[in-house]
Amino acid sequence: MKHLISMKDIGKEEILEILDEARKMEELLNTKRPLKLLEGKILATVFYEPSTRTRLSFETAMKRLGGEVITMTDLKSSSVAKGESLIDTIRVISGYADIIVLRHPSEGAARLASEYSQVPIINAGDGSNQHPTQTLLDLYTIMREIGRIDGIKIAFVGDLKYGRTVHSLVYALSLFENVEMYFVSPKELRLPKDIIEDLKAKNIKFYEKESLDDLDDDIDVLYVTRIQKERFPDPNEYEKVKGSYKIKREYVEGKKFIIMHPLPRVDEIDYDVDDLPQAKYFKQSFYGIPVRMAILKKLIEDNEGE
């Protein structure tokens, strides 16, 4: 694997290989022993958009592996403020680091960067397009908490139009056997047509709903997303749909599903849900560390000597 840009670039076997490696990384983390698996290697985190969990978990993952981190997050103090292009920025930084994690507001930015980089590029989100490392940690969470991915029933709730985590995960789940998907959203925020057409072509069972009350009782995973205000071209459209769904304690109690959320949370899950056994979103966030350790290790090892 040269880069990790989109879930469409990797198959089911490679996904399972990464998940297996992540389990080993989690076990190594639990020993509390310092690791030297990537000693002498440097990760560059290049973020053109805000991030807390993704950037910090990648930086933590690299340091846990014994590597070092350089970072570019304050665009005002970088050459980007002077008008430097993404291509030139990547060309320069790829001479400093062994691997780059990139987040950019433009769809296709990570793919473009990979064409000019001397080192592996990991896409940490390109607009509303893809977020493959979030998808891999989501799959890992499902595997760890449910015990399987094949045969699950999962409901996606909220912003399905602009939610890049949803787009990536839906595609990845379509590679597994007998997965059923439910899409709960306002009409304005339904899943993009190209993704729907892909599911139809693969004969994946899916159902579009507008109410949580329409979901079956045997759902395994409730995947909740925030309404992404920053993606709306018209603020008035955001006002129409904000707060469309709120997961309340009384709705969750007694249910068999686990609740996942890519975070940050705004108001779509009440805080008093957090202590219920179904709430797995903070554990999901933690799982990002062993998963990203596995990704960093694989990409650097796969590209050594090329």
Curated annotation (Swiss-Prot):
Chain positions recorded as carbamoyl phosphate binding sites:
53-54, 103, 131, 134, 263-264
Keywords from the UniProt entry? Pyrimidine biosynthesis, Transferase
Which Pfam family, any one of them, does this sequence belong to? Answer: OTCace
Please name the GO terms that the record assigns under molecular function: amino acid binding; aspartate carbamoyltransferase activity
Q: Output the superkingdom of the source species.
A: Archaea
**Cellular component per GO?**
cytoplasm
Top enzyme class, one word, equals transferase
Q: Which GO terms describe its biological process?
A: 'de novo' pyrimidine nucleobase biosynthetic process; 'de novo' UMP biosynthetic process; glutamine metabolic process
| Functional pathway | Pyrimidine metabolism; UMP biosynthesis via de novo pathway; (S)-dihydroorotate from bicarbonate: step 2/3
Catalysed conversion reaction: carbamoyl phosphate + L-aspartate = N-carbamoyl-L-aspartate + phosphate + H(+)
InterPro entries, per the entry: Asp/Orn_carbamoyltranf_P-bd, Asp/Orn_carbamoylTrfase, Asp/Orn_carbamoylTrfase_sf, Asp_carbamoyltransf, Asp_carbamoyltransf_Asp/Orn-bd
Q: Give a yes or no for keyword Disulfide bond in this entry.
A: no
Q: Does the keyword Transferase apply?
A: yes
Where L-aspartate binds, per the record, is at 82, 164, 226
Subunit structure of this chain's protein: Heterododecamer (2C3:3R2) of six catalytic PyrB chains organized as two trimers (C3), and six regulatory PyrI chains organized as three dimers (R2).
Which family does the record assign?
Answer: Belongs to the aspartate/ornithine carbamoyltransferase superfamily. ATCase family.
Q: What does this protein do?
A: Catalyzes the condensation of carbamoyl phosphate and aspartate to form carbamoyl aspartate and inorganic phosphate, the committed step in the de novo pyrimidine nucleotide biosynthesis pathway.
Q: What is this protein called?
A: Aspartate carbamoyltransferase catalytic subunit
Q: Gene encoding it? A: pyrB
